[in-house]
Amino acid sequence: MSRQVSLDRLRNIGIMAHIDAGKTTTTERILFYTGRTHKLGETHEGAATMDFMVQEQERGITIQSAATTCSWKDHRINIIDTPGHVDFTVEVERSLRVLDGAVAVFCAKGGVEPQSETVWRQADKYGVPRLAYVNKMDTIGADFFRVIRMMEERLGARPVPIQIPIGAEDTFRGVVDLVRNVAIMYYDDLGKDIREEPIPEDMRELVEQYRTRMIEAATEADDALMEKYLMGEELTVEEIKRGLRKLTVECKINPVCCGSSYKNKGVQPLLDAIVDYLPSPLDIPPVQGTDPETGEPAERKADDNEPFSALAFKVVSDPYVGKLCFFRVYSGQLKSGSYVLNATKGKRERIGRLVRMHANHREEVEVVETGDIAAAVGLKDTGTGDTLCTDAAPVILESMEFPEPVIQLAVEPKTKADQDKLSTALLKLAEEDPTFRMFTDPETGQTIIAGMGELHLEIIVDRLQREFKVGVNVGKPQVSYRETVRGRVENVEGRFVRQSGGRGQYGHVVINLEPAEPGSGFIFENKIVGGVIPKEFIGPVEQGIKEALQNGVLAGYPMIDVKVELVFGSYHEVDSSEAAFKIAGSMALKAAAQKAQPVLLEPYMRVEVTVPEEYMGDVIGDLNARRGRIEGMEARGNAQVIRAQVPLAEMFGYATDLRSRTQGRGVYSMQFDHYEEVPPNVAKPIIEKAQGKA
């Protein structure tokens, strides 16, 4: 079967940017000009084709990366629109993993904004070639050349403009195509009346300067071009494009275009640049993986005749077809109705139907080929990051890394009916989003949800109520405290005696209690000599002590890191029983803990904050105010990484706080490190609240 579109004419690209740089509008325009939509969708009207979740249309931001396919000049372009909010970086991570190239959209006024830095670093990590598009050239304060400077300074990029704007703000009329050396003028706001004209006189000098710079960059691609240029010969348009394309694919330069998507200016030249400079699946190195049977490295080339391999990068619950699994085909072909092996989980799966997505419309297809991005219906066990392949040639492709969730809160169903729906809904959401976790708190029995930030959890709760119709009450984020003792006490007794007619109860133990090494939990030592307590009653004593440790004497939190020695006791021939000794053990522990200087412990987190140098003092001061201890600092690129230990109780709301302190340019990660004593002034209100005094 011959391919519909040859591999060299396929482009898998992502569109990435800061919030409000206009990337969803840009995608909308691309779809309009490539004939996929017949009506322009405006983000601010809540009608954008790519933003199809209710939450996205209300907030005017993109949360889930929607995938869509379109055609331009005999090329097929698969586009993934990615969110620009820091709480959703996982969506960006996973789309970058399966793309071959990307378009970074910058706002002509805001330039390189904080999220642009984060997204750019993620693209660097995956080695994704990209071109830049400076949007909103018609807004007040638009400055194309300032954005170019910011790309160099903040991103360490090497931008090479292939267009420069004609006019700016309300006089923005078109662009100069530096490669073909012509002016493209727009005479209306619908992008219908477009004319090619000679370059305006007053811009000749500027155009010459930037064109020379672009041609010099192109000649670095190969010696033949360099030689021709140095001999003073003119390079042809084809040669310039070939040179720029080679360097872009190698991630050495970033061609830059400009326009105003909203006013329909500059979108067609951007499409031309996507086709001209971004890589096809043939331009990128073969994908690497491992053979699950031998553990040896394996690779798959982009070729329809190679064995089938694909990476699942997103799972969504669709109200009509159930579970939709998005995947990128790296090699071979796949027909609908066939069986595949999920090599990551070692399970065979049947592909029910194959669909190519256009935002939220689907088009059923019989077969998908190398380089395609499509979705499958019917994969029950496949999750994000799993590899799909043939039984005959299994391979596990490199998966994705997802950060651990850093914030958690309790959710409770409002009614009994909600109770049953809650866990099903949460499981579905956890399947879609690898950075969202849910678990039951063993101490309170509450359902806890954890995620990447407050906005992330807010949207999860919102989706529970809207999509899954589950009513929930949301608690405040909580901390799990612990208790321990600081002093040693000896010969504390626990005596449980009931002897008033009939079979009595008799248990009597004497214990010593002392602090144990941090992290050791609970140590029990039997020092009974001469059989004062028979062997069969020793186990129940230990059991009773363990149960008593679950509820500490200060505030009812579990006690950890204590050592108990059982030193003496007595028993009664008839009345002693396992139950009596269990109760005696727990009574002894409670009495001993009261006397052994009990203290409250809190979880300390290992926190890493990455911030631009100018905010460092402010951020360190703030961490100190949060009872944090700074452990060290190091430079990473043009940012500083601060490492600190901070109590979890002080970290609530930190994401929002850091964002405002650093104008959104700071990012942080944290994970649990150890438990440590709570200072008396902080512990007092916690203990009083637990004892019901507060």
From Swiss-Prot:
One of its GO terms (biological process) is ribosome disassembly. It comes from the Bacteria. Residues 8-282 form the tr-type G domain. GO terms for molecular function: GTP binding; GTPase activity; translation elongation factor activity. It is found in: Cytoplasm. Residues 284-303 are annotated as: Disordered. Keywords: Cytoplasm, Elongation factor, GTP-binding, Nucleotide-binding, Protein biosynthesis. SMART domains: EFG_C, EFG_IV. Catalyzes the GTP-dependent ribosomal translocation step during translation elongation. During this step, the ribosome changes from the pre-translocational (PRE) to the post-translocational (POST) state as the newly formed A-site-bound peptidyl-tRNA and P-site-bound deacylated tRNA move to the P and E sites, respectively. Catalyzes the coordinated movement of the two tRNA molecules, the mRNA and conformational changes in the ribosome. This is Elongation factor G. The gene is fusA.
